[in-house]
A protein has these predicted regions:
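NAD(P)-dependent short-chain dehydrogenase/reductase
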Residues: 97, 168-171, 192-264
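N-terminal Rossmann NAD(P)H-binding glycine-rich loop of SDR-like oxidoreductase domains
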Residues: 54-74
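Conserved glycine-rich Rossmann-like NAD(P)H-binding loop of the short-chain dehydrogenase/reductase
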Residues: 76-91
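Hydrophobic/aromatic anchor residues within beta-strands of the central parallel beta-sheet
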Residues: 111, 155, 178, 216-219
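Conserved S-adenosyl-L-methionine
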Residues: 71-78, 174
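Conserved Rossmann-fold cofactor-binding substructure of NAD(P)-dependent oxidoreductases
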Residues: 110-133
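Conserved Rossmann-fold NAD(P)-dependent oxidoreductase catalytic core, especially the SDR/UDP-sugar
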Residues: 130, 136, 140-201, 206
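Flexible, Lys/Arg-rich cytosolic regulatory linkers and terminal tails that connect or flank
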Residues: 2-53, 171
Length: 264
């Protein structure tokens, strides 16, 4: 097949065609969901979502956007999409509108261009809405970029001070719960990114010890397949440009979880 450059595509199932969910023209490139068993999962159930308001920082990123999708399907009162990238914010807000239309949802989706390093902006947003839960997914996480001597200070400012800023805003505005998305690289860190996330974890643990009004927690993900900057998109790009496909060691073994699994 390699010699004749065959492309692999997926076509809709017979049940999807019969039920008019899809058409024969809906041919798509092969995705991770088609290969991995269990990659497609049901959205997480959120208690009392209809009366709750959520803020997701880094809402346009790989993890933040999936958290947004899963919460949105519970039809919450408000979702605030807090995102530094204009393009990513545009994409996730547009996707939310499509989901709301197809699922007949009534959530108030509020897109906010913001930076967790900007304390005044955080104060304004948190004081403007009665936020119940924060999912803090905003971070600089690309190890080689963060490791560069020109970027270390900005990475620390964003990942450490930014986390402190948004956590303080949550405390000052009586948020009920705050969940920080972290990484296994924060365990005995060997690089700058891991060190900044470890520092952030210490901040969250300390704030949780001294604040009874808000529940702080965090989750540490391992390798998330197909997230931005991970090896799968890199391999796809390398193959598309004719190679070579680069790995750190010929005997390396990695374990992955999918973005929906991690977010769920």
């Amino acid at each position: 097949l390699e010699t004749i450059k065959v492309s692999v595509r997926t076509v809709p199932s017979m049940s999807e065609l019969i039920s008019d969910q899809k058409r024969m023209t809906d041919i798509q490139a092969l995705s991770i969901d088609d290969i991995l068993p269990g990659a497609r999962i049901t959205a997480a159930s959120v208690k009392n979502a209809a009366t709750r308001s959520f803020l997701i920082s880094g809402a346009g990123g790989s993890i933040g956007s999936e958290i947004t999708r899963q919460i949105l399907l519970n039809n919450p009162k408000i979702i605030i999409l807090f995102e530094m990238s204009e393009f990513n914010l545009f994409k996730i807000e547009r996707e939310c509108r499509v989901i709301m239309s197809s699922e007949n949802l009534s959530t108030n989706v509020i897109p906010v261009l913001g930076d967790i390093r900007d304390t005044e902006n955080l104060k304004h947003i948190f004081s403007s809405y009665s936020i119940d839960t924060v999912y803090h997914a905003a971070a600089y996480k690309h190890v080689p970029l963060v490791e560069d001597e020109h970027n270390i200070a900005k990475a620390a400012e964003n990942n450490i001070l930014g986390t402190f800023n948004i956590a303080q805003a949550a405390i000052q505005n009586n948020v009920n719960s705050f969940v920080m998305i972290s990484t296994d690289k924060a365990v005995r860190p060997t690089n700058v990114m891991g060190a900044t996330k470890r520092f952030s974890a210490i901040i969250i643990q300390s704030l949780n010890d001294y604040n009874d009004s808000i529940k702080f927690s965090m989750v540490r993900f391992g390798n998330v397949i197909n997230s931005s900057g991970s090896v799968i998109p890199l391999f796809i790009d390398q193959i598309a440009f004719g190679g070579p496909v680069t790995i750190t060691d010929k005997d390396v073994m990695r374990y992955f979880m999918t973005i929906p699994e991690a977010s769920n």
